[in-house]
Amino acid sequence: MILVILHYPALMPTVEALRADKEKIVPFFEKEIPGLIDKPWGTNEKTGRGASVYHFEDMASAEAWFNSERQRDFRAQNQATIEFFDVAAIAYKRPLKEKVSV
């Protein structure tokens, strides 16, 4: 498994705005990127920085996505830095869409 982290200037001014914007494109990431396991977006309102974390099944899948024109354009337009990591262990795993019982 491969972990990829992108850092860039915040895409939206608040976490609520980022959530509303990114929820529109979640289906693309769920269906159109081979080998992608999950992908959260994050923002830090205090620092004005944003991040995306990708988990891929393998390096070939990660490289295919990050070499795509869409990703190259995003990184160029947003001065994004990118770093790849081999995943050594996972501490906890559950679906994000799981409903919590009260």
Map each language-model feature to its residues:
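Short loop/helix-cap segments at secondary-structure boundaries that form the rim of catalytic
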Residues: F74
